[in-house]
Amino acid sequence: MARAFLFVLDSFGVGGAPDAAAYGDEGADTLGHIAEFCAAGAGDRAGLRSGPLSLPNMSELGLMHIARAASGQFPAGMPLPEKVYGVYGTANEISRGKDTPSGHWEIAGTPVNFDWGYFPTEGDAFPPELIEALCRAGDVPGILGNCHASGTEIIARLGEEHIRTGKPICYTSSDSVFQVAAQEAHFGLDRLLTFCRIARGLLDPYNIGRIIARPFIGQSASTFQRTGNRRDFSVLPPEPTLLDRLLQHGRHVHAVGKIGDIFAHQGISRVIKATGNEALMDASLSAIDAAEDGDLVFTNFVDFDMNYGHRRDVPGYAAALEAFDARLPEVHKKLKPGDLVVLTADHGCDPTWRGTDHTRERVPIIAFGPGIRSRSIGVRRTYADIGESIARHLGIPAGPHGRSFL
């Protein structure tokens, strides 16, 4: 039998999406622009990193060639490896959204072929009847925010008023989300999660993809910071995913990080919580040790998106990529004959782009493991090819939406 390890570098797009213009993202290229800025010295930060972007391990697995296939050019300032050892390619997204659930579900073989509900960008974001029902059911005196906002900005702006009044901070973005920020000690973490569960039920008729609990600590705008107790309350995928199919065939799915939340805990055998990319890698390595024949370990490395992409932080994103790349040899050392590792992303979030939202981009596909022969798999029609390749590797029947590249 075989094992598979699927690592999603959240938001690590490689540009070139053929439909990017329809999303206002023509020219967006997360990898390409980070490399360009680093090569020009704009990715330097004292005490963090300096110089051109350096990803030697992913480059040897085909990342440079992926970038050229996706966007038409090699990333600036990054040397070409003498030899490529991985299976490498890039994929288009066929789901209509450029959000986290759409990307992950499509990776798992289930594209999202419907439109999510979204909130208006002008005026109040949420209908009065929704707010009234939520405040009544959630036993709060009102809400703050009621707008599109950056999470860190709105906490800094409204956090002190939230502490004084007990009103949760509710906001949204260009994604199909309803986000609730509350101070852990003053409002209470359990109360926040209960409030979000209530919101999940009330928002189902609006077809909103996720309710996100955003707890924070601190007493003033200068000291507020988010904690690792974030929770996502997602709707169920529209049809069985790779995860469900694996469970149906007696396999186990080890969900590391926020994977369990993204799939509404459907198709999951074991949830492993960790906060931050370093801890997520540690947890993934432990899950590799625990995985049995036929199992899947599925990890989302969220820091790229949450801490650096949305915040448009080029040096931070570059440093996080370099730190991830430096730990790949630890993954290699864990592998046994029959193992397969796949690195990919769920969308882009170009830290040089206007605004703070995701960007529509192609994503990288890197696959490697003992006995895996290096080759290009070109540009794939859909992320679903990733899930179908894992299905084939693990010996379960193919699904309807993708084609294996193995």
UniProtKB/Swiss-Prot annotation:
Top enzyme category: isomerase
The protein's annotated pathway: Carbohydrate degradation; 2-deoxy-D-ribose 1-phosphate degradation; D-glyceraldehyde 3-phosphate and acetaldehyde from 2-deoxy-alpha-D-ribose 1-phosphate: step 1/2
GO biological process: 2-deoxyribose 1-phosphate catabolic process; 5-phosphoribose 1-diphosphate biosynthetic process; metabolic compound salvage; nucleotide metabolic process
One GO cellular component, as annotated: cytosol
InterPro entries recorded: Alkaline_phosphatase_core_sf, DeoB, Metalloenzyme, Phosphopentomutase_DeoB_cap_sf
Listed cofactors: Mn(2+)
Binding annotation for Mn(2+) 2: 305, 310, 358
EC number from the UniProt entry: 5.4.2.7
Coiled-coil segments: none
Cofactor note (record): Binds 2 manganese ions.
Signal peptide (from-to): none
GO MF terms held by the record: magnesium ion binding; manganese ion binding; phosphopentomutase activity
Alphabetic keyword roster: Cytoplasm, Isomerase, Manganese, Metal-binding
Catalyzed reactions: 2-deoxy-alpha-D-ribose 1-phosphate = 2-deoxy-D-ribose 5-phosphate; alpha-D-ribose 1-phosphate = D-ribose 5-phosphate
Protein's job: Isomerase that catalyzes the conversion of deoxy-ribose 1-phosphate (dRib-1-P) and ribose 1-phosphate (Rib-1-P) to deoxy-ribose 5-phosphate (dRib-5-P) and ribose 5-phosphate (Rib-5-P), respectively.
HAMAP family registered for this protein in UniProt: Phosphopentomut (MF_00740)
Name recorded for this polypeptide: Phosphopentomutase
Organism encoding this protein: Rhizobium etli (strain ATCC 51251 / DSM 11541 / JCM 21823 / NBRC 15573 / CFN 42)
Lineage: Bacteria, Pseudomonadati, Pseudomonadota, Alphaproteobacteria, Hyphomicrobiales
